[in-house]
A protein has these predicted regions:
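Acidic, proline/glycine-rich low-complexity IDRs
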Residues: 1-27, 31, 54, 64-72, ...
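N-terminal interaction modules that seed assembly of large macromolecular complexes
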Residues: 26-57
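Structured domain cores in non-transmembrane regions
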Residues: 47-94
Length: 154
């Protein structure tokens, strides 16, 4: 069965909202340096990730989301997202069939909405962070954030 992108969009928006609520109980959201979603180059999973401004300067690899203090926070909120993405597996899980030209803009649009609602007026950088680095990360950071904030990623 192909991925149901409209259903995925709603599930992802809800998961991110729940994630932000959980994260806000742990830290003042204005104290974050970065917030976003982490994935593979196949886009076969999406997980929340965030790091604080206080820890940012001491990180040996600042752009390694797996090292961020809030990597994977509220992952349970993404169960429906995970299930919907699993629909993209074909041929006994040998092939992951995703329309990246459709999915990446969908994710970026939802993250841009999150930035408007939760981080307007802050310097929190929001993005789609892809394992191993990827043009999607660069594109998402530029599309989601004000130019001054996006410059921090370069």
């Amino acid at each position: 069965m192909p991925i149901r992108y409209e259903v995925l969009a709603d599930a992802l928006a809800g998961a991110l909202q729940e994630c932000l609520g959980i994260l806000a109980r742990e830290v003042d959201l204005r104290e974050l340096a970065v917030f976003g979603l982490y994935t593979s180059g196949e886009l076969n999973y999406l997980g929340p990730t965030a790091e604080t401004k206080s820890r940012w300067p001491s990180l040996p690899f600042q752009w390694s989301p797996a090292d961020w203090v809030f990597h994977g926070i509220a992952q349970d909120a993404f169960k429906e997202v995970d299930a919907l993405l699993l629909e993209g597996w074909r041929d006994g899980c040998d092939t992951f069939d995703v329309d990246a030209e459709r999915l990446v803009p969908l994710i970026v649009s939802i993250l841009a909405d999150v930035r408007r609602r939760a981080f307007t007026g802050t310097d929190v950088l929001v993005g789609l962070f892809v394992a191993g680095g990827h043009r999607w990360t660069d594109q998402s950071v530029e599309m989601i954030n004000p130019p001054k904030v996006a410059l921090r990623y370069r």
